[in-house]
Amino acid sequence: SKGEHFISQTEDKSKWAAAAATYKRIIDMGQYELHTVAKIVNDKGTGTLPLPTTVSSADFPDGAGDIDPYKSYRSVFDGTYQPYSVKEYIYYCRRSDGDDRLYFPSGIGGNATFSVTQDMIDEYRMADGRAFSEATEAEKSYKAVGSSSTFALEYQLSSNRACRDDNREPRYYATIGFNYCIWPGTSYRGTENLKNREVTYYEDGNAKDASNNNYRNRTGYTCRKYIHQEDIGHWNSTKKSKVFPLARYAEVLLGYAEAMNEMDSESFTDEKGNIIQRNPDEMVKYFNQVRYRAGQPGITIAEASDYETMKKLVKHEWQIEFAFENRRYWDLRRWKDAYDAYNKPIRGLDVSAKMSQREQFYTIRVWNTEVYMKRMFSNKMYFWPIDRNVLQKNGKLVQNPGWN
């Protein structure tokens, strides 16, 4: 080019105001709401987990007192409900079962190759809302908890699980498969011992395919977000039909809070004459709906009033609430955070350790032994290159920076 920017280099807060106004119109329609499942109460100790004292016990949406946060979040994705009954969905598509094999361990019909990085795992908070980095050394320990439990009538926690996988927020259990995680597979009708499989990712564990070393997990964690309790990757079984949410109401709530935060102290008037300005009360009200549905503490007016604090909270919530929903790729780019995020080494547990080497297994290491584990990002990658054939057809076009 002639030194002219094709994209304005001047920040325009009115665009955030327009986004906030659009999100608020969707909220005010009253057509959508966060999906929730009622609290489960029984005398067997297998119902809804007690709320930490840091989480409001008021009824939803002012707290999480009358809902089961684990089932409320999990059932948005696992096919428990027909899509027409989930008011959170704004737009969705039918989902293929093909990628389930990436999640399932080899022993129950998968190849266990979907590996979640340690950086992602460490973003999940403790049940009481503390960051994992604020957990005690005992809570971060590799040692076995030593006792089993069941909650939400269906989720079983093995006594062999590490302390670091205990007492985490409900979305952790709804989303992550970890070492000694139990995969129910209740629809299995065969004679093999495949139901309630306690999966391990050790070198000699039961998650990998002994005949093909490529079919194994690389970090010791996988994704279970789209796996129903009935699902199992075996022909003598069934799988729940599922949809993939392309847009859901939680996006509207987080988007509204983010847009209001980015307006700073300026105020704007929309085409209908409405005044749009940063409102911490509104930010807290709608942001906290997402937090309460997840069984997490709400944020305060003081936190919402501080721009940098709120920005960090918003980014964290986007990352966890929308984990493995094809959002992170775009969020990192629109925030211009991709360079830092992708130029970090991939970390995970030491899956080369054997079952007799438990402490070594839970030692966090950098995985860079295979080509596809080495990732990089340069600033030119914020834009895609223009195809050479297109450039040759139109001499007035200019290649995007860095792609010459």
Regions found by a protein language model. Name each.
Residues K2-A18, S267-Q277:
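Short coil/linker segments at helix-helix boundaries
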